[in-house]
Structure formats: C-alpha cells, structure tokens
C-alpha cells in the first residue's frame, strides 16, 4: 500500500489531486532535463551522478538539450550540469520542473512535483520501497532500486554503506536515454559489481627500469 493510501485510510478521507501553483522563472535553456541530487535523507542521495552525466551528456549535447541541476545551495554541484542550486524559490522550482523534458532524482519532493506535472521520471530508491513511496501522481516513469531479495530497505536516514549506490550508473543512463529517445541510441550493458572503491581514483606507477640490488 502506498503511503498516501495509508494516510487516507487512517484519516478516513478521500484522495484528491493537490493544487500546485508555480511561479515563473526564466530557464537558462530552451530544452532541458532536470537533476535533483539531494534529499532530506543522506541515505537517499546517490553518489555516482557524475558518471551518469558523463554517459548521457554527449547524447544530449548533440540534440541541444541541457541538464539543469536544482536543489539547495549546500548540495554538491554535479559536473556537466547548469547549476540552479540555491537560485530558485520553491514555486520557481515548480515552474522549472513543469517545463522539463525528464526529471532524474532520488526519492525526494522534486520527483513528486515533476510527477504531478506528468514529466517523465527516472527515480532512484535505496532505503525505501518504491511501491510505497513513489510519486503518487505520475506519467511515464522508471523506478530503479537495488536488489532487495536478501536485504530489505533500512528506512534509516544514514547507512554505513548506502544501498542506493548499488544501482549501476550505466543502467540509469540507459533507462533515461531510452525514455527520451527510444531504443537504439545507447547500448544496454550488464554490470557485475560496484564496490566501495568505485568512486576512488587509483594511480599505479610502474617503473621502466630495474633498480640496483643495493638501493635503499
């Protein structure tokens, strides 16, 4: 049961579609998708958006589509996006979302607002079940989550090893491009493992000489 249905059942009221009043804000691009990398819970925040953007940006650039990042001032800026972090009021953010071609985000308020406007959604889940917390009003969508067969969602605001980070960046990129343009634009690849050192840069230095035996 979805949380909205649960609340309605508990309160004994009917579910009706809310009214959201946006406020005009001039978008810095004519055609764009939106990214919201933050949320109210650290465990919901996906750590590998940079890799997703590196895959999809060349494809979007060819078609004149920008990536606008919305969120708070303290949210980390994702390379390859136009930052609107801390630059829009809440209702102005609603306007930006309402005109977006697609919205990519964690399980956060922005996905629910974008879904209200029937904006196509690619939404990531980690510490919560998608079927209970997904945007209640939505159009075309793809909800991605880790494998819950062994370990169920924690519903904790902090996780020592974030479950959401088990979602492969190439899977997100594939679903996003497929939703925008259909099949055939990007190849679907099968990933095997995404470890805790995935985001670390490791440099191996291999000398091109044999050191002397008495070297200290």
What residues fall within each predicted segment?
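Catalytic machinery of carbohydrate-active enzymes
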Residues: 1-216
């Amino acid at each position: 049961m979805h949380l909205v249905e649960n609340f309605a059942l508990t309160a004994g009221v009917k579910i009706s579609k809310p009214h959201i009043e946006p406020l005009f804000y001039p978008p810095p691009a004519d055609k764009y998708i939106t990214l919201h990398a933050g949320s109210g819970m650290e465990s919901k925040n996906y750590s590998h958006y940079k890799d997703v953007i590196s895959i999809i940006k060349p494809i979007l650039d060819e078609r004149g589509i920008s990536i606008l990042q919305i969120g708070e001032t303290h949210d980390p800026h994702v390379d390859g996006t136009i930052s609107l972090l801390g630059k829009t009021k809440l209702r102005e953010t609603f306007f930006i979302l309402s005109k977006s071609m697609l919205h990519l985000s964690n399980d956060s308020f922005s996905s629910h607002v974008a879904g209200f406007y029937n904006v196509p959604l690619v939404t990531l889940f980690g510490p919560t079940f998608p079927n209970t917390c997904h945007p209640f009003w939505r159009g075309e969508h793809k909800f991605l989550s880790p494998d819950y067969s062994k370990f169920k969602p924690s519903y904790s605001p902090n996780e020592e090893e974030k479950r959401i980070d088990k979602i492969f960046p190439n899977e997100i990129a594939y679903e996003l491009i497929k939703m925008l343009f259909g099949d055939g634009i990007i190849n679907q690849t099968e990933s095997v493992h995404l470890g805790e050192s995935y985001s670390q840069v490791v440099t191996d230095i291999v000398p091109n000489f044999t050191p002397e035996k008495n070297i200290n």
